[in-house]
């Protein structure tokens, strides 16, 4: 796939504050077709379980489909293509060599559009992965950062420098989603970005991409997207198969948020 030229390669300076969480994000295929984005998330035991958060609408909700998925790590361009340039809107040189196959469904719920998978194999040390923290507090944040695979192409980063807004999906009344507004000249999201994480200023996952009107050509309020909230997904539909709490805090610590875990095993400073 090819993503819009306004999007920003993760190797660009805009990624400098997020080098750790960039390594938690992956593209994946569904039954042989490049499909959506997801991310590796930490749990309160800090035990490197391969929990992978994506969107319910991506359809990774049956055992057969989950077993078919191939996850592609570190799929990104090697150089910073100037945003807006023709090269930024063309195929890059990202490699699909670092991959793993298969997952099981742990929990999913349409209300906040989340699916939590557990990948079948442990992390390959050569991939240098990162398990991102999360934040389930019921609040807005002063800004946010998205890391994603637009059109399931090379990994990109988009920053929001204004406060999030709690809402329903696509402007509906409700509290299940975070409405995130992109910079006028910065990156956005696209189909294929679905399921990708939105990070708080503290670099904790607040939710995953459901959708929205954003595109490189969008302006004003249309240059925005909606993310299903970890806050909502935490209790989900009230069962272990429809909520995050049983998996991301199996010990029942009651943590409101946790930080990420690097592949070296020590939590970041």
From Swiss-Prot:
Query: What intrachain disulfides are recorded?
Result: 6-216, 12-80, 36-58
Cited Pfam families = Trypsin_2
Which locations, inside or outside the cell, does it occupy?
Answer: Secreted
EC number(s) given by UniProt: 3.4.21.50
EC main group: hydrolase
Give an example GO molecular function.
Answer: serine-type peptidase activity
Gene Ontology CC terms, in alphabetical order? extracellular region
What GO biological process term is on the record, naming one?
A: proteolysis
Q: Which reaction does it catalyse?
A: Preferential cleavage: Lys-|-Xaa, including Lys-|-Pro
In biotechnology, how is it employed? Answer: Sold under the name 'Endoproteinase Lys-C' by Roche.
Could you list this entry's UniProt keywords, alphabetically sorted. Disulfide bond, Hydrolase, Protease, Secreted, Serine protease
Catalytic residue positions? 57 (charge relay system), 113 (charge relay system), 194 (charge relay system)
Family of the protein in this entry: Belongs to the peptidase S1 family.
Q: What does this protein do?
A: Highly specific endopeptidase that hydrolyzes lysyl bonds including the Lys-Pro bond.
Record-given protein name: Lysyl endopeptidase
């Amino acid at each position: 796939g090819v993503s819009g030229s306004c999007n920003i390669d993760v190797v660009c300076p805009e990624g400098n504050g997020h080098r750790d969480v960039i390594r938690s994000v992956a593209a994946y295929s569904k039954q042989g077709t490049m499909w959506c984005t997801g991310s590796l998330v930490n749990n309160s035991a800090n035990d490197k379980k391969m929990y992978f958060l994506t969107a319910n609408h991506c359809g990774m909700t049956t055992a057969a489909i989950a077993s078919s998925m191939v996850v592609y790590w570190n799929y990104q361009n090697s150089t910073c293509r100037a945003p807006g340039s023709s090269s930024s809107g063309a195929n890059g040189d990202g490699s699909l060599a670092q991959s793993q196959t298969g997952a099981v469904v742990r929990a999913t719920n349409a209300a906040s559009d989340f699916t939590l998978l557990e990948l079948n194999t442990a992390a390959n040390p050569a991939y240098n992965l990162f398990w991102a923290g999360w934040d389930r507090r019921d609040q807005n944040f002063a800004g946010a950062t998205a890391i994603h695979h637009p059109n399931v192409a090379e990994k990109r980063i988009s920053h929001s420098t204004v406060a999030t807004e709690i809402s329903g999906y696509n402007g509906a009344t409700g509290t299940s989603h975070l409405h995130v507004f992109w910079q006028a000249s910065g990156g956005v999201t696209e189909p294929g970005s679905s399921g990708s994480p939105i990070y708080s200023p503290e670099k904790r996952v607040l939710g995953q991409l459901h959708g929205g009107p954003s595109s490189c050509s969008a302006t004003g309020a249309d240059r925005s997207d909606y993310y299903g909230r970890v806050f909502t997904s935490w209790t989900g539909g009230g069962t272990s198969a429809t909520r995050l709490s049983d998996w991301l805090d199996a010990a029942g610590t009651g943590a409101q948020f946790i930080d990420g875990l690097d592949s070296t095993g020590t939590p970041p400073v």
